[in-house]
């Protein structure tokens, strides 16, 4: 079992990479690339399930850890591991990959080899971001995640893919240059890219305060653009409008939010505390701004983009509230957001494929024709707006309660107003698409309800929303080990003179109200 535990993260990284290479060399006939990609994604998902099955809740620090020298100069290590912060995010990424492939099964008809190879490469990069504990290794995966996504948007966009891809690439790539400079500065000062080592040296070292502020700002800028945090959201609506459904449902928000928690707060707690009031204010503006713009959208892709801005801003508020309970709620809501958005994007993609428009006023009265589609769309909508007994309620309740007791009652009231507006625009979307009189478009086309294969993909997502709402302790038990500071423990996979700290084991943080 120890051999499996020591190699499981490497397998999770290598299997989708090998699948991408196999898709690239396979003949493009009889949907062979589709089947190779699906089999690869299912195997990878199965590997990710090993992590929660063998995760030790009472053990602090990183688990399934591997730390091996890779490049001697500069000293870059193959250092990977997971803790409660990243555990469920790895599983979520594994779950969404086969769902994304099924969602693309009949919509990607040309250059399928390119699509599925790049999609699996994107998955490799996402897994790498979540498990990397060497900052240069992390940076490599971070940059790798940008390239396949930009190419996929450019090649498979709906109307103006190249322009949306260029905007996405410039917005997200340019801030990565200061991040690289910051990493090199840290290496010049410490001789290490290792996250655990840097965490200790920064907290106990004698660095220039002004230089460290600039380094922390470079980290924050790269992550804030990727979330995105208001007002750095200029790429979001075009990307959601043009990105293939599989891509939009897989990547929305998770990488930037995780990186904020792991690397910005985890490495620079003092600097994070200094900028927290500003980020809290921007997050609340983003919650309300996104919700108000979502209310007036006529295009459902753009509505989903601004809804995402509002919901991701709520998670940002929880992160920079700097309370342990807020961090629990943030990670939980990232998971819920990933599940709910996957269901909504998949269902909206099916509607778009049938009716060839994303204009909301072109729809109407579809509940009678597409009852299964309508039912699952309503369930996903209720999950997004936070109905009790669904996962969205748990995440929003934890976030708002932690903000109320640990940050500001005024900010909490403003954030709660954004949540209420979220219910308004999502329920209005349901009403306009599925209820009321039929539009000329929907009346002229029979419409196809979900077939058994699509139901088999969507039903587990609906069940997962319910399980997350009814049994939150199952998920929170692992999350808490990643955000609560346990006693320091010696890592078996780290150098003998390095102590493993979980990402949140920072004495200057986590002192706010629980």
Protein language model features and the residues they cover:
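Transmembrane helix-loop-helix hairpins at membrane boundaries of multipass inner-membrane proteins
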Residues: 1-8, 22-119, 192-202
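Hydrophobic transmembrane alpha-helices and their helix-loop junctions in integral membrane proteins
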Residues: 99-106, 124-136, 149-432
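Cytoplasmic/organellar membrane-interface segments at the starts of transmembrane helices
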Residues: 370-373, 426-504, 514
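Membrane-interfacial helical/loop segments at transmembrane boundaries in membrane proteins
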Residues: 63-71, 194-204, 402, 480-504
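Central hydrophobic cores of alpha-helical transmembrane segments in multi-pass inner-membrane proteins
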Residues: 10-25, 38-53, 90-104, 122-124, ...
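Hydrophobic alpha-helical membrane-insertion segments
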Residues: 39-54, 172-183, 377-384, 420, ...
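Short, aromatic-rich membrane-interface segments at the entry and exit
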Residues: 9-10, 31-37, 136-140, 276, ...
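Alpha-helical transmembrane segments and their helix-start/interface "positive-inside/aromatic belt" motifs
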Residues: 31-42, 163-173, 370-375, 452-460
């Amino acid at each position: 079992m120890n051999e499996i535990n020591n190699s499981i993260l490497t397998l999770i990284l290598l299997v989708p990479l090998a699948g991408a290479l196999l898709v690239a060399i396979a003949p493009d006939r009889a949907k062979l690339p589709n089947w190779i990609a699906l089999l690869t994604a299912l195997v990878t998902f199965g590997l990710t399930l090993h992590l929660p099955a063998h995760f030790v809740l009472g053990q602090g620090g990183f688990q399934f850890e591997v730390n091996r020298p890779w490049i001697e100069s500069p000293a870059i290590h193959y250092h990977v591991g997971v803790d409660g912060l990243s555990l469920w995010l790895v599983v979520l990424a594994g779950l969404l990959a086969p769902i994304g492939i099924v969602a693309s099964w009949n919509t990607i008809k040309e250059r399928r080899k390119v699509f599925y190879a790049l999609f699996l490469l994107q998955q490799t990069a996402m897994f790498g971001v979540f498990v990397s504990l060497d900052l240069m290794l992390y940076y490599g995966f971070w940059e790798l995640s940008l390239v396949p996504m930009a190419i996929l948007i450019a090649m498979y966009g709906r109307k103006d893919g190249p322009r949306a891809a260029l905007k996405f690439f410039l917005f997200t790539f340019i801030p990565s240059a200061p991040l690289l400079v910051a990493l090199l500065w840290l290496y010049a000062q410490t001789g290490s890219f290792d996250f655990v080592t840097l965490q200790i040296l920064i907290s106990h070292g004698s660095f220039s305060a002004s230089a460290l502020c600039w380094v922390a700002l470079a980290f924050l800028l790269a992550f804030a653009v990727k979330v995105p945090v208001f007002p750095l959201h200029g790429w979001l609506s075009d990307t959601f409008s043009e990105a293939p459904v599989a891509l939009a449902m897989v990547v929305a928000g998770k990488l930037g939010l995780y990186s904020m928690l792991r690397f910005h707060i985890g490495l620079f707690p003092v600097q994070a505390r200094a900028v927290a009031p500003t980020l809290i204010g921007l997050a609340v503006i983003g919650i309300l701004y996104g919700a108000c713009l979502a209310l007036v959208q006529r295009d459902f892709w753009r509505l989903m983009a601004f809804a995402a801005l509002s919901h991701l801003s709520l998670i940002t508020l929880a992160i920079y509230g700097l309370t342990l309970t807020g961090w629990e709620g943030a990670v939980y809501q990232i998971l819920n957001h990933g599940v709910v958005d996957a269901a909504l994007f998949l269902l909206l993609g099916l509607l778009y494929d049938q009716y060839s428009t994303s204009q909301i006023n072109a729809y109407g009265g579809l509940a009678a024709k597409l009852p299964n589609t309508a039912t699952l769309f309503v369930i996903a909508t209720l999950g997004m707006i936070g109905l009790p007994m669904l996962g969205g309620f748990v995440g929003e309740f934890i976030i708002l309660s932690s903000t109320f007791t640990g940050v500001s009652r005024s900010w909490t009231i403003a954030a709660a107003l954004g949540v209420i507006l979220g219910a308004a625009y999502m329920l209005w979307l349901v009403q306009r698409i599925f209820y009321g009189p039929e539009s000329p478009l929907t009346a002229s086309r029979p419409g196809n309800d979900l077939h058994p294969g699509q139901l088999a993909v969507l039903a587990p997502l609906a069940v997962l929303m319910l399980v997350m709402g009814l049994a939150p302790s199952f998920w929170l038990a692992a999350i808490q080990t990643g955000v609560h500071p346990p006693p320091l423990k010696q890592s078996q996979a780290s150098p003998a003179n390095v102590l493993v700290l979980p990402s949140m084991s920072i004495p200057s943080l986590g002192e706010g109200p629980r």
